[in-house]
């Protein structure tokens, strides 16, 4: 976002859109102020357009009012057929974050925030997990198929700070007795996420590893609009993603390291009914803030057995969305851990890695310059290589970065 709107002036507007169900086929430089937003889009195998898939029964029904055929819906919970409605996408019916959504054994649900300061000198990401998908403890607890473990016994808040104040990273997994979830709040040990009806507050007091440096403070995310866009990432509809507040402002107050800043932010959620490595081989995801302060997202998913699924969506400031055709893939330089990244960019605008923020055996986060929708943009970009997550060497390394407090 480039306008410096004050969070107090934000007015949250829910957008009542969930994609319909259908059966699909088959490094240099610092942080840039022009960092992306994020969204979701039409799903395509390769580049052919497909309707987005949301599994039946997972979508919240409309509020009280007229029903097809002339009937009326009474206020309150439940479907027209008398059944229960399961929350989907880590959000409530109005699009606001909802933290008490059920998660099946072996499954996961996470809320993701990234942000960059207006001056481009600072950045951060937060990921709050129910069912810590990359955790070796969660996988080992789930038995031979890693699908029997209790997700609420494996929760974590991942914090990554970048920029002038130095780089810090924490991700301590905590057991059920350290966790509490309600509709508006998610508590993980000494940290919590809280939705107050207008903004998302994240308060945290964590310690990094292997160097034990404290990360303490609070941030507040002010959505410009709430979005109910949810789409499936896999052909079976067991893994879903959607932005909650793709165009937001953020206020950051850190006690350790001591720094204050404000900027533009993005909030989304991912969820799955099974371990994340089941259907996917890899994905590249990117979000960019456009010249009009809208957010464009490309989710480029490669499945193990079915075709590619490409989601390309532009999220406008009023909460509405516009699908677009993703430009061609371009290979990026491999990381130190030999992850082969790609970026979608328009012909004539070579993709350029401006900075690699995270370089791990299975995941890379970068700032990438590319051409998108007729503009030159800098995106927050990630590459995930799922087969590496389940290898024994990686699982034996992860406890050094992800300790557990049961």
UniProtKB/Swiss-Prot annotation:
Which GO terms of the molecular function aspect are on file?
hydro-lyase activity
**Can you cite an annotated GO cellular component?**
plasma membrane
Query: Might you give the EC number(s) for this enzyme?
Result: 4.2.1.131
From what superkingdom does this record's organism come?
Answer: Bacteria
Q: What class of enzyme is it?
A: lyase
Spell out the activity-pH relationship. Optimum pH is 8. No activity is detected at pH 4.0-5.0. At higher pH values, it shows rapid decrease in activity, although 50% of the relative activity is still detected at pH 9.0. It retains much residual activity after 30 minutes incubation at pH 4.0-8.0, indicating that CrtC is stable in both slightly alkaline and acid environments.
Q: Offer one example of a GO biological process linked to this entry.
A: photosynthesis
- Keywords annotated in UniProt: Carotenoid biosynthesis, Cell membrane, Chlorophyll biosynthesis, Lyase, Membrane, Photosynthesis
Q: Which reaction does it catalyse?
A: rhodopin = all-trans-lycopene + H2O; 1,1'-dihydroxy-1,1',2,2'-tetrahydrolycopene = rhodopin + H2O; 1-hydroxy-all-trans-1,2-dihydro-neurosporene = all-trans-neurosporene + H2O; 1,1'-dihydroxy-1,1',2,2'-tetrahydroneurosporene = 1-hydroxy-all-trans-1,2-dihydro-neurosporene + H2O
Coiled-coil residue spans: none
Q: Which compartments is it annotated to reside in?
A: Cell membrane
Tell me the temperature dependence: Optimum temperature is 30 degrees Celsius. Enzyme activity is significantly lower at 20 degrees Celsius and 40 degrees Celsius.
Its main subcellular localisation, reduced to a broad class, is membrane
Q: Where is the composition biased (Low complexity)?
A: 21-34
Record region (Disordered):
1-48, 61-101
Pathway it belongs to?
A: Carotenoid biosynthesis; spheroidene biosynthesis
The similarity comment for this entry is: Belongs to the CrtC hydratase family.
Instruction: Give a short account of what the protein does.
Output: Involved in the biosynthesis of carotenoids spheroidene and spirilloxanthin. Catalyzes the hydration of neurosporene to the corresponding hydroxylated carotenoids 1-HO-neurosporene and 1,1'-(HO)2-neurosporene and that of lycopene to 1-HO-lycopene and 1,1'-(HO)2-lycopene. Can also act on demethylspheroidene, spheroidene, 1-HO-3,4-didehydrolycopene and geranylgeraniol.
Q: What is this protein called?
A: Acyclic carotenoid 1,2-hydratase
Q: Which organism is it from?
A: Rubrivivax gelatinosus (Rhodocyclus gelatinosus)
